[in-house]
Amino acid sequence: MNAEFRAENKWVAAWLLEKNERKADIAARREEILRSPSVGMPKIPSRSGKVSDPTGVAAAKLAELQVEERWIALIEEVEKRLPDKQRIFLELRREAGNLQCDIRGRPAWVPYVQYKYPLVMAERTGKKVAEFYMSHPNTYTAWWNRIIEYTARVAAKRGLFG
């Protein structure tokens, strides 16, 4: 069961990090499907004797996109529910992406966010940078894990896994 939860959390983390790219990709694929010249064409018998239904094929492709669109909607809803501090954290976490190297035993995104977070918060609030500096990096990993867990629970309630 732990392996299943870890796999789901990894899936959720990817959706959280890549939401903007995936949303653009989904929109492009939807547009491609809808602009396909075969949509709306009559059914055409093929050489094998099977009937091709271009509109049906397009509908099936659009149905596949609906699952991905439900994930995007979920991620956007979760973002809206987050407190401002965590929403800004998530923006920075996305910016950092999946920096792969470890810096003193921590994933590379942690020091990146630890550096940028107080700067962004100070800029947005007009307060001093020092007011937002968190010396303990575990705060950021705890926020990240909490966002992942919350998103995974909501996704499970909506039947988005398997």
Regions found by a protein language model. Name each.
Residues 75, 110, 126:
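Generic structural marker for isolated residues within well-ordered, non-membrane alpha-helices
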